[in-house]
């Protein structure tokens, strides 16, 4: 048999074994999630080059050039990534390095890299099978591609990845009952996970916002799922998913139906809106952690978040206007003082032509904080954008 034929035969045999593994694992995954498969997903091998091509395709599909430029400007203005960092190549290299398998909703297929080792294979297949099952009950594409809804999307990703993380424990370690695990266990494993990830070059050199954003859905999401399974026996979390990372971080807010307040920003002086979105409680934590370097303090300062909205404005994308609303005056006052300290550090070595203003306001009877960071000669200083609140604890 020629070398090419032999390699092809081995590939066919490998895919047959993979399909057999999927069929044997499907009932166990169904039992672990409480959901039944409506159809069997496809499963295919892919080379590492094909994995990279997929990452590029999905990244460009999710963030077309205009959106990418807007988001990158926002992250630079907040100080969450360095001005020198180019988001697209950084994320593509990092995701290519990280991905050990993926489920593609468009083709209803699990794709497994050809170079994956046998130790990882069962773990990856069990995890991605959960995503295939989730896609049969909710539209994954519509959830993970919500535009200008960063925090809600992050909360949804935490549910999807958290459920898959918990379910794979039941698949790989049947003797371990997830409901018996201590609450908060997964998030406390971050240090150990970070040590493992530090061996991966792209992850180790990525900014805090990227590193923590990749880890949060798995660990923070898994902790929420453990809580949910204890609190709502027999119910599916997919039927009523959290709407904010606040509800992931503080599950009692989910239980109490504490929904985030929606903010609508209206322009003052005519200007070009380059990007608009929100941070949410989790990324507000990351902002403080990045600027102040103290994780416990960052968590305290972000607690009490009830909603936020920011805009990137100006022809040069050099204006940031950020409104946030808080549960009460105490939380807003604490946040304001923390943001003033953090922003002073942020701008300590900045251009003198940039002006920053942080104010605690009362709008519609609620405690609201406004940050404006813009060039001194920005025309919008004469009539700043305003905000309207709706929903939440109005």
For each predicted feature, which ranges?
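Auxiliary, metal-adjacent structural segments of Zn-dependent hydrolase domains
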Residues: 20-119
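Pan-zinc metallopeptidase signature
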Residues: 198-317, 323
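Short pre-active-site segment immediately N-terminal to the catalytic Zn-binding motif
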Residues: 109-126, 149-156
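Acidic helix-start/capping segments at beta-turn-to-alpha-helix junctions
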Residues: 38-58, 147-151, 182-191, 242-246
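Active-site recognition of the HExxH zinc-binding catalytic motif
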Residues: 29, 123-140, 164-165, 328
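C-terminal soluble interaction/assembly domains
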Residues: 306-394
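Bacterial signal peptide processing site
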Residues: 6-8
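Post-HExxH zinc-binding segment in Zn-dependent metallohydrolases
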Residues: 25, 135-141, 145-194
């Amino acid at each position: 048999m020629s070398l090419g034929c032999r390699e092809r035969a081995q590939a066919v045999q490998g895919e047959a074994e993979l399909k057999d593994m999927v069929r044997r694992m499907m009932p166990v995954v169904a039992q672990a999630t409480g959901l039944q498969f409506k159809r069997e997903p496809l499963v295919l091998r892919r080379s590492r080059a094909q994995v990279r091509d997929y990452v590029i395709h999905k990244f460009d599909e999710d963030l077309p050039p205009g959106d990418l430029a807007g988001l990158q400007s926002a992250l630079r203005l907040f100080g969450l990534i360095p001005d020198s960092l180019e988001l697209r190549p950084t994320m593509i290299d990092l995701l290519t390095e990280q991905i050990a398998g993926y489920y593609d909703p468009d083709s209803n297929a699990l794709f497994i890299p050809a170079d994956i080792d046998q130790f990882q294979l069962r773990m990856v297949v069990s995890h991605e099978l959960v995503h295939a099952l989730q896609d049969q009950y909710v539209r994954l594409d519509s959830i993970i591609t919500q535009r200008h809804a960063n925090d809600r999307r992050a909360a949804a990703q935490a549910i999807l990845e958290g459920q898959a993380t918990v379910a794979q424990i039941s698949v790989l370690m049947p003797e371990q009952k997830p409901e018996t695990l201590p609450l908060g266990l997964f998030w406390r494993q971050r240090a150990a996970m970070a040590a493992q990830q530090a061996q991966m070059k792209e992850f180790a050199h990525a900014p805090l916002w990227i590193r923590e954003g990749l880890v949060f859905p798995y660990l923070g999401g898994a902790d929420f799922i453990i809580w949910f399974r204890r609190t709502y026996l027999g119910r599916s979390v997919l039927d009523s998913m959290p709407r904010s990372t606040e509800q992931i971080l503080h599950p009692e807010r989910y239980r109490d139906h504490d929904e985030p307040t929606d903010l609508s920003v209206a322009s003052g002086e005519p200007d070009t809106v380059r990007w608009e979105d929100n941070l949410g409680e989790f990324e507000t934590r990351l902002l403080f952690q990045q600027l102040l370097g103290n994780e416990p303090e960052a968590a305290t300062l972000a607690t009490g978040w009830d909603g936020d909205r920011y805009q990137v404005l100006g022809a040069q994308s050099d204006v940031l206007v950020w409104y946030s609303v808080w549960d009460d005056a105490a939380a807003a006052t604490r946040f304001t003082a923390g943001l003033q300290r953090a922003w002073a550090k942020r701008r300590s070595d900045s251009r003198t032509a940039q002006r920053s203003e942080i104010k605690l306001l009362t709008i519609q009877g609620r405690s609201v904080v406004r940050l404006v960071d813009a060039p001194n000669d920005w025309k919008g200083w004469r009539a700043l954008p305003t905000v309207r609140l709706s929903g939440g604890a109005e």
